[in-house]
């Protein structure tokens, strides 16, 4: 039985899932929006929202925690100095997922995930 096993495997091992989440989070925070599959967007959302909530702390410790997952210094700087203050009064829900149709090659549902 698969009870209590939250999360999606995305046909990857655990280190590849972490690498995918970090890479997509970096791209989303740099660009403001990215297009990906619906399943990947649903997995990315809590990862990014936790990063932004951590960044809202605003201190050195918060910056170092964000830098553990975002390895691009420019993106870390942007998250700490621009993104986190923007959502200072917002208690969560920093991202939005919009369906944008299906991919022609394999018919998978595509989605646009963006910062609100």
UniProtKB/Swiss-Prot annotation:
GO terms for molecular function: rRNA binding; structural constituent of ribosome. The keyword rRNA-binding applies. One of its GO terms (biological process) is translation. InterPro entries: Ribosomal_bL17, Ribosomal_bL17_CS, Ribosomal_bL17_sf. Keywords: Ribonucleoprotein, Ribosomal protein, RNA-binding, rRNA-binding. It comes from the Bacteria. GO terms for cellular component: cytosolic large ribosomal subunit. The keyword Isomerase does not apply. Belongs to the bacterial ribosomal protein bL17 family. HAMAP family: Ribosomal_bL17. Binds to the 23S rRNA. Part of the 50S ribosomal subunit. Contacts proteins L3 and L32. This is Large ribosomal subunit protein bL17. It comes from Deinococcus radiodurans (strain ATCC 13939 / DSM 20539 / JCM 16871 / CCUG 27074 / LMG 4051 / NBRC 15346 / NCIMB 9279 / VKM B-1422 / R1).
């Amino acid at each position: 039985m698969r009870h209590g096993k939250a999360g999606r495997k995305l046909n990857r091992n655990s280190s590849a899932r972490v690498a995918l989440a970090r890479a997509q989070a970096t791209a989303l925070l740099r660009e403001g929006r990215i297009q990906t599959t619906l399943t990947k967007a649903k997995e990315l959302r809590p990862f990014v929202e936790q990063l932004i909530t951590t960044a809202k702390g605003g201190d050195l410790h918060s910056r170092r925690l964000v830098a553990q997952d975002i390895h691009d210094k420019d993106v870390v700087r942007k998250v700490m100095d621009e993104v986190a203050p923007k959502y200072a009064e917002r208690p969560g829900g920093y991202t939005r997922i919009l369906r944008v149709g299906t991919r022609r090659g394999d018919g998978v549902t595509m989605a646009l995930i963006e910062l609100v």
